[in-house]
Amino acid sequence: MTLLALGINHKTAPVSLRERVTFSPDTLDQALDSLLAQPMVQGGVVLSTCNRTELYLSVEEQDNLQEALIRWLCDYHNLNEDDLRNSLYWHQDNDAVSHLMRVASGLDSLVLGEPQILGQVKKAFADSQKGHLNASALERMFQKSFSVAKRVRTETDIGASAVSVAFAACTLARQIFESLSTVTVLLVGAGETIELVARHLREHKVQKMIIANRTRERAQALTDEVGAEVISLSDIDARLQDADIIISSTASPLPIIGKGMVERALKSRRNQPMLLVDIAVPRDVEPEVGKLANAYLYSVDDLQSIISHNLAQRQAAAVEAETIVEQEASEFMAWLRAQGASETIREYRSQSEQIRDELTTKALSALQQGGDAQAILQDLAWKLTNRLIHAPTKSLQQAARDGDDERLNILRDSLGLE
């Protein structure tokens, strides 16, 4: 039995290829059934995200194993084998275990240390358990990877610092305001970055959010999710005074929030401070706003310095995390090898017990027929000894004939010979 991890990710393949190799939730069961129908596959898990598609497999070794699995993947997705082969990575046994542990811990992610991947790996594993796993070693590998990811989170700072613009903006707000639960936040825009910001703010107990967008329809789904109020961009001037924090990210070619608008808002707020985080390019907030007293303006470049600093911290933490992964993968493989030895020991014990039972039954039968007890016991002892040492004796003789001193010493050691 061999453990494999093979696939493509954001480092090896462009999005144009990654999108062709994805497995949709609707077809995942069918794909797993097809995968397990391959004669060499004992069990499988399919991990498919926007940044990676990977197969984790327990397989029987055979000739052309790699070719057979690549062919299955290409046939399933109607791909040219050369296109896939140039982007595919292939990990076996210890390397496969290490790879899964790194993936689950966020060490192989586009954003180093991002936590979402662990949930995606857990879902892939859960989906595979619906009648598709069929391999205890593979199941144990995933369970171990989950505990390793938790250990990495607990024992290192891999997830402690913001490394996305959205998260950095929220981190900045939390550094400036003692509690976000009492502030009002105005979000300008309704794109992906603002969506992430809104979710981060909701996680940090922000109670009052206003979302301003050019079209109310696009903002409505987000407001339903986070419980915000929707206004149009034209309403910003009137509502700016209500906001303690303004975070803006639109595609507007011209500034949306000008110096005069902020001056009026500050006057209405009796100069209560305002934090403005402009993460748009081109900028949504006129740079002159930063010169106003009690208006604290941060641009995307300011956030980038925070992100760069935090990324360096994560990279330092990643070194610690890699050490944990290396140690845990080594321990897992030792456990797996021990399972193989346990099976051999069970087979050897069963074989020995079968010989014992066979000869004992014959001896008891002879005694019941009135045979000489001493002679029967001596015969039992002689036959039992010969049957039990027959296979080791042949192995010792063969090692001696082959001149294989290393094997001979291993056999001597296993038989307890001085």
From Swiss-Prot:
Gene3D superfamilies: Glutamyl-tRNA reductase, N-terminal domain, NAD(P)-binding Rossmann-like Domain. InterPro entries: 4pyrrol_synth_GluRdtase, 4pyrrol_synth_GluRdtase_dimer, 4pyrrol_synth_GluRdtase_N, GluRdtase_CS, GluRdtase_dimer_dom_sf, GluRdtase_N_sf, NAD(P)-bd_dom_sf, Shikm_DH/Glu-tRNA_Rdtase. GO terms for molecular function: glutamyl-tRNA reductase activity; NADP binding. It catalyses: (S)-4-amino-5-oxopentanoate + tRNA(Glu) + NADP(+) = L-glutamyl-tRNA(Glu) + NADPH + H(+). The record marks 99 as: Important for activity. Pathway: Porphyrin-containing compound metabolism; protoporphyrin-IX biosynthesis; 5-aminolevulinate from L-glutamyl-tRNA(Glu): step 1/2. Keywords: NADP, Oxidoreductase, Porphyrin biosynthesis. Pfam families: GlutR_dimer, GlutR_N, Shikimate_DH. Its EC number is 1.2.1.70. NADP(+) binds at residues 189-194. Catalyzes the NADPH-dependent reduction of glutamyl-tRNA(Glu) to glutamate 1-semialdehyde (GSA). HAMAP family: Glu_tRNA_reductase (MF_00087). Belongs to the glutamyl-tRNA reductase family. This is Glutamyl-tRNA reductase. It comes from Salmonella dublin (strain CT_02021853). The lineage of its organism: Bacteria, Pseudomonadati, Pseudomonadota, Gammaproteobacteria, Enterobacterales. The gene is hemA.
